[in-house]
Amino acid sequence: MRGIALETVTKAFEGLVAVFDLSFVVRPAVITALIGPNGAGKTTIFNLISGLLRPSAGRITFEGRDLTRLPPHEICRVGIGRSFQTPQTFGHMTVLENVMVAAQVRGSAGWLAAGLRLPAALREEARIRELALTQLRFLELAALATRPAGIVPLGQQRLLELARALATEPRVLLLDEPAAGLTQAEVRALRDVLLRIRGREIAILLVEHNMRFVLRTADHVVVLNHGQKLAEGSAGDVARDPRVVAAYLGRAGEA
């Protein structure tokens, strides 16, 4: 199966069941949104997929390969990238250097070669630099390449998080509330960026509380409630589902 699949996944913490018997698929070139009230299990699912947690039952596969017992760095190398709700940047480093750090996951030169500045390590550094610059150009951040990341505005920090994730050359991209704190103009720009990323045949799974953004951006929506799947389908179908409206969308619309 192409994409990433959760197969009857359950996660319990000392008797508290955070996710129960959950199954869904995130496919290439599809933007899938994972929505639900606070405490529904969305962050737990991201942590399960990225290897920060392990399922209590069930399994997670990518292109047919079982990821359930792999550590986070191996999952990243397999092709699963992630951005975080709070940008995980190094404020004292430049924008370009931040992306280069993330791109190191695709590096092959050993620490000894790098420390001795051997020709292979220098070639590797040049390749990593170009990979990072490619992502900055794609996200229209190249003009900020030499600027310290700590002084970049929030909207551009969100894009920098995306650039860092893309620099790992993912085939699946996990985005944790990418629109949080953005202006309407920045949200529109973010939507355009995600559509362009989708055009690269990358599978996108996003958690987002901005329902207008979700309904305008996502191709497919999975709705959680108390750790279980409440509904699944197109954005339009989910928005009209009375169970979803009662459990979540009605309250989100009132907020």
Describe each PLM feature range.
Residues 1-255:
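Glycine-rich phosphate-binding loops of nucleotide-dependent enzymes
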